């Protein structure tokens, strides 16, 4: 059977994008190697901002819906020394991820999308030298004018491509966060975790879960799950968390690196975790992927209309829209955060005390970063090493942001832009560079 689009991967990015495409009148097949019963079972609970429902046209999850647990509306932050509470008001829904995906899939199917589980991608299918579908591990040929990689961190389709406009890098141990979650029962019945509190210095947090009197204690770390467990011990030794009994643990990975410089080439688009689309401050991926997907659906539909083939040129606007918007903002933030965590707990405490980088909603923005940091150095509250690290990282982040805002309109100008972007990212380094105790 022929399709307009085949999507490899049926989690949040692939399922959401499928629904957008069928609403544009396209014939869409979504495949996933997992069974429907085991899909996305690596994590149970997620925290999803309620503003995202309206932003992305998704029916809100409410009490009585099987995926819904509860809402909360405050996210707190504290320094490495557990001081200077920051308060940010964000409406958040606590959801069961597998059931949330199930509801997204139900909507997509009702709108005309097809799903097949237990079906794995083996290689791309070509006609006249152009992508024309996929071949499964079972040897089945699925014809389609366009292929979308939503396969997650493995990025099985993107990594199989050999194309000057598509990077085939692997998201390795230095390029992702290994997330360790402890589901716990609090010993004191008078202590309730009803909102989220994070300690960014330790990449640690405590947040609500689905059982009464319970909480989730989590950390994220580069390199390995073993190192994440070491970071968890360091976090719990430094921060006085409520006493608890461990119920069970979950472990998963999220990309933590720059996305590909181009998401498209002839007959192809990469989205979601396969494109390393996550929020630098906390690793959240669903809204970041959907920011890319929302305009991309109309661009893909236009490229495929009247039986047309989706060339790189027709799809290029997907690149430009994302990279000059969220891509530019996140490039700057990702580079700056490298400097923000590469310091001592005392340095981090100074940032919190003065609302530098980490601030409450009602605190003013720091107008002159260098002046504020120099005052800290003179007062003996902020180290010269941290000053150099943070100012350098901020400059590198600003350079990256400005470069992304100049993303080329024409694919012919892409190689020169990408060459400079490589150079800027090599200067900025990686969050894994800050690891000193692995």
Task: Outline where the language-model segments fall.
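Glycine-rich phosphate/pyrophosphate-binding beta-alpha loops
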Residues: 42-45, 94, 203-205, 275-287
